[in-house]
């Protein structure tokens, strides 16, 4: 085992041989890195719980057709028999990954983390008796491993007897045994660590090196066992056929609903009392229907980050959150300040916040100290027992009581974004020119360039749940798994500036002087809508605003009635939904984006009179204002791609919740504050929980089918855009997404074929 190390030592006296050896080592390093990069392409990144992002579980296979990718992955997973030695390797790998990647849950921190996973393993593995079983030869081998992970991979591949032509496949198989942990490491190295700055650096090269070292010790015949997999694709082919049948039925039903509405697509309405711009999220669709029925209101759909690639630091927060799609890199840093009306309680708020921080620090120190946890339980046990009783028996009352106590100690204050460019600290804020540019692009993308109402509400969204590790999965995906109200508030603040409006007028967007913009947030769990600063505003239209608040409450009630039918509850709708948002034992506070099926890019008039059952992403778009297709290009290459990620996550979590989901919430354990495991040692679960897609163990609630994109625009414009972008060719021609065009000139439906030709749908 140590021949490679010995070779390094015995050749130090021969300069020519040393040069040749160094060249060989460097060449090996490059070859290993190239192989790892190749196999990593098929790995799907796994985002941490705090910013849980929907992602296609087979993202790395999108270069294949949908059918080929599913067959290859499903048959491979079903063809892997139980292997006790493999399970032992997995157990040790989980132990090392959990220790290294922990971000504050563990009491003791793993040493040497700042030097990387492999380096830390190299220094500590000789002391791991569970791994080497006190074998002197294995301990000696561990102590003499190469310092570079690439060299360790080469050494282990040779020891395992993996043939050169099989090495890349073997490395692929090595990653596939723990795709969750490997995917999380890929996220760190390729998404989180975009600037190369990481406190505890880690890469898939480290991961593979550590795993292969463990494999050499515990499963030396691994390369032979990998050849014994059996594959059977018959069940998978039937699964794909069932998906196709659902897709065909849904497409016929949707197009049948749209057909009688085509003549209304370009009808211009009179000036509305209020316009509300919601996220394209499928949960917005039923609420939009409810509010439109209650008054002269117009609603629009737009990506929930409102076109602003920003990072936002909360008023009370110590961290900065990226509030834009993960496909984008934030360009601007924004922070918050208290509004003038809250000046009287700022001091009280700051003192209360400091008091709570002190209590929290003391509690954490007592809880995680070696000697004090028992004393902590003895002293706080009765109070914790009372709290547990209230949370379990009366969650709504417990939530209200907690909120009232928090208000007494640390009163909440309303804030506003600070977004003007700081001339001294140019990393903070947005320049005036960029404010104008982003405001114009947002208005044009949502089709709001004229006929402005007196009130325009930009409505982001978020959720409210208790004891839910997957809370961020219910928040706004377009905001990177964060709540979208702050983005809405920021865009409203920009558009309320007179200088911005004047610049927009020069570019053809005339906003009336009596138009006022507000930011708001829609709670998708309870359907409450909070309009920011509406109670302290000194502007006009208070009568319209008061009526809008009343109608929003009624829309909440009506939508609760509609949603409760899907939640299988016999209680009062409003009461039960309020309970779900506060009950810490509730495994299904809401259905999230389950049953999503279509992405419609069209004027609201086309869908306004249709009950789409909360299954459609709705993006407002008027092709007559976009003759060159520039706006449509942005919609198809950004929000539609995000919708496809969401759709495929729900699809694969439904068809195989063990392989692509995360199993039942009941047996979840949070691991290192980064993800969840099933039980005390499993792969890092990387999909949706069973309760997010299944009514019960044998009945799915989500209907697994690929995304159907419907675009109301001329076919030739769409064809040009598809040919222009590889991502669109991949998604449409490999049939990960279906595309239907509604030609506004003849009102016929056309389906895009693999050859970039169109066939009429009868």
From Swiss-Prot:
Designated name of the protein: Probable inorganic carbon transporter subunit DabA
Top-level taxonomic group: Bacteria
Signal peptide limits: none
Record's subcellular location: Cell inner membrane
Gene Ontology CC terms: plasma membrane
Entry binding sites for Zn(2+): 279, 281, 461, 476
Quaternary structure and interacting proteins, as annotated: Forms a complex with DabB.
Gene Ontology molecular-function annotations: zinc ion binding
Membrane topology label: Peripheral membrane protein
Reported function: Part of an energy-coupled inorganic carbon pump.
First-listed, main subcellular location of the protein, grouped into a coarse class: membrane
Family: Belongs to the inorganic carbon transporter (TC 9.A.2) DabA family.
Cofactor: Zn(2+)
Species assigned in the record: Legionella pneumophila (strain Lens)
Keywords of this entry: Cell inner membrane, Cell membrane, Membrane, Metal-binding, Transport, Zinc
